[in-house]
């Protein structure tokens, strides 16, 4: 299972909010990420480039429950 918990921590450290992601991607994509639903790697790439962070700062892989 993919978790976006690292992204929310990264945003807090950067002094940003989820709504700031709307400038990078759509509100629908942010909503999907809030529910840990899959998004494209292109979206992850755009977030990483915009925030100046690595993939590990955006997603983590967790074992299925």
Feature map (PLM): residue ranges:
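Alpha-helical residues within the helix-turn-helix
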Residues: 12, 23, 49
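Residue-level detection of the helix-turn-helix DNA-binding "recognition helix"
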Residues: 12, 26, 35, 63
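Residues within the helices of the helix-turn-helix
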Residues: 8, 19, 31, 45, ...
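Short alpha-helical DNA-recognition segment
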Residues: 15-31
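Short C-terminal boundary/hinge segments that cap the last helix of small helical domains
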Residues: 52-65
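Short, contiguous strand/loop micro-motifs
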Residues: 4-5, 30-34
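Short, basic-rich loop-to-helix N-cap that marks the start of a DNA-contacting helix
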Residues: 36-49
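A short, Lys/Arg-rich alpha-helix, primarily the initiator
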Residues: 1-20
């Amino acid at each position: 299972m993919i978790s976006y918990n690292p992204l929310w921590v990264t945003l807090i450290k950067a002094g940003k909010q989820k709504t700031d992601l709307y400038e990078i991607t759509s509100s629908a994509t942010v909503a999907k990420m809030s529910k840990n639903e899959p998004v494209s790697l292109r979206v992850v790439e755009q977030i990483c480039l915009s925030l100046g962070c690595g993939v590990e700062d955006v997603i983590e892989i967790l074992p299925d429950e």
